[in-house]
Amino acid sequence: MFPKCCVGVALVCVVAGAKAQDLPFSAPSSVDSPAVPQAMADLAERLIPVYPKSNQLDYLNALFTLQAVARRYRDAGDTMRSIRAISVPDSQQRRDISLVFESYVLAKASEQNKTDSFTGAFSKQFRAVLAPLDNPDAYRLGYAFSTLPFYIRRAMAAALGRYGSASGVSRDEALSLLRLYLALETFSDINPLVGGLIAQDDRRRYEINEDSVIRTTDGATVSAVVVRPKGAARLPTLMEFSIYTDHAAEAAKESAAHGYVGVYAFTRGKGSSSAPIEPFERDGLDAQAVIRWIARQPWSDGRVGMCGGSYNGFTQWAAAKNRPSALKAIMPSASAVPGFDRPIQRGIYVNGFYPWVPYTTDKKWDDDATYNDDARWNLLNRTWYLAGDSYRSLERIDGTPSPIYRRWLAHPSYDLYWQKMVPYKAEFAKIDIPVLQTTGYFDGGHTGALYYFTEHHKYNPNADDTLVIGPYSHTGGAQNQSDDVLDGYTIDPAARIDIHQLRYAWYDYLFKHGPKPALLSDTVNFEVMGKNEWRHARSLEQMSTDRVRLYLGPALGASRARLSEQTPSAEAHVDQVVDFADRTDVNWTPPSQILGASLDTHNGIAYETAPFEHPTEIDGALSGQLDFIVNKKDLDISIIPYEELPDGNYLRLSEEFMFRTSYLKDPSHRQLLTPGIRSQIPFNCACITARRLSAGSRLVLLVSINMRQDRQINYGTGRDVSDETIDDAKEPLKIRWLGDSYIDVPFRKNLMTGAD
């Protein structure tokens, strides 16, 4: 599900780092400071007369923000009308957000002029814009109005922190900060009002049952929200099955708004169910029970499709494993594979899933306060890392029992405990319903989505399983509306699609004889970054036209080495030492930017090609072989591809491919290394990319050893890694990367000539 808290942030990202400081500005000490409103108003007033007018639309958009923050509300309303006279928003989301801000400033103008209270004026504005809309448009606009201020507040706090030591800000920085403040002010003021207004509007559109109870095959119960369009005949149902409870009614309502029965069912134990909450374990059978229940209802035409992402993507595969007859199609996005990509990623436990357990299991509803307690979880990671205790000690350090996480630690292999949760091997052959999967190059669920896709096609060559992938994040375009800018990278206009719109177009095609979405013209549909173009292929392998082998060659300097077609000499190697006992890097933060000014080679080596003479396109997954000698029985490795741009910036090309070498060949069976003996380990990256590299760019492959405070640390003894401690780090890891290491790069254009 898409967190509402992100909708408002999407259009108000803060741009920091501009060199010119045109406006003196002393940032308030915190977002809670009573000085914030006046400081923002003063900054807006000073920016109004100096903001450039070279582009009329850009100027008017900026002027609206400045006038609103300066409390010139009537002027801001006039400016919005001027904007509408010369421009139409380029996306549904932008149109909706602009209506939210316009409604807000008009209500504030009424309050300021003493013609009405803010509550009264805003309520009238809200009803006026929502009443004439059809169900889909009313749903989208209501969703925009419902944006939660929590993450906007967090972003505002971070922005003030960045400028805390500065004496001034540039015009662009000031405008970004003021846009963020306007979003925070707007959604903080309207949030207490919107829920009741939307509920009032919903009553004339939908039949809503927020607590349907369904009996499972073993006698337990699960609860569900059911939303139907008023006056509708029997309809197909679109269902989500989830451990998350926030926004359940809205998710079901979205499907009802598009002419389906919307059902949002919960993992047993959530909502009104009295059973224990156990993530993953019973969702498949319980989802099957809900599907059978739906098919028996008088409002159902007997056809059920599933949708949703992340955990809600996993539950679709869990349900399909059991092949309920009423389940006619699934559309999983950014799907999780329990035991394979969460809470373990290819053998490595990730700390981020430790707070996820209380978030989803401590209460009947999502425990947002606990999950968002960054201070608690950051302290846990830091304390554990500095102490060098075993991974099992997280529970003791945190001071709160976590029997579920303890249970997960008992299953480090992809064993029967995990295998029974989703289709496994030959079970994929029996899944013969249409499947549409979506994910992103920068989606943390990328690995899981590609696992399902490749296994389904492997065991069922005739599988009707289609993939859509582009430059998307987990909560952005992989599941929802694409971002415009993602962690510094400006997404191509062609890639800015709305996965929810695709969802309903696809289900209309399957269930209502609508046209097939044009985007789905082949099995693999991918956007090529930098080319602003979608390509289509029959398979992942056919994304590219050629594969070129590049060898991880000799060292070029500190943490740098050559990547080239030339086979290195037999004695070529690169030595690396990682001291697992050294925790002086405790304040190191892994880079999050997709586009950045430098490459962080922490515990890694960057292998780089010579600059390309011609524009060069890479489409698909890297594969290759790592050839090395190490003094340990096991190690954890990370591989990330980058483009070093001609201007010296670095663009990350995909999500990180990280793995434990002992589980790379077979996730269900650990195979240790022999210290001091040469190892050659083939790999196929579980992450893919598509990017047109410009002439003058280099391909850079960052190969790193995992050692960080937010992941399990593999000390290499060969014992269960959860039992290892810093006492096992007496001898640093010493690895010699040998010259027969290589990667096979999937090019569309020949590397050397640039020919097609």
Predicted segments — roles?
Residues I431, Q437-T439:
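Short beta-strand/loop motif that positions the catalytic acidic residue
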Residues L193-A233, F612-H614:
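N-terminal cap/lid segment of alpha/beta-hydrolase-fold proteins
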Residues D134-S188, L197-Q200, A257, K321-K430:
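Accessory cap/linker subdomain of secreted extracellular hydrolases
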Residues P229-R296, A478-I491, L645-D647, M658-F659, ...:
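Cap/lid segment of the alpha/beta-hydrolase catalytic domain
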Residues P298-Y311:
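Alpha/beta-hydrolase fold nucleophile elbow
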Residues Y385-D389, G477, S482-D756:
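C-terminal, loop-rich substrate-recognition/catalytic regions characterized by aromatic stacking residues
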Residues C307, F314-N381, Y441, N460-Y504:
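A catalytic-pocket lid/entrance helix-loop region that shapes and gates access to the active site
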Residues T447-T466:
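Active-site-adjacent alpha-helix of alpha/beta-hydrolase-fold enzymes
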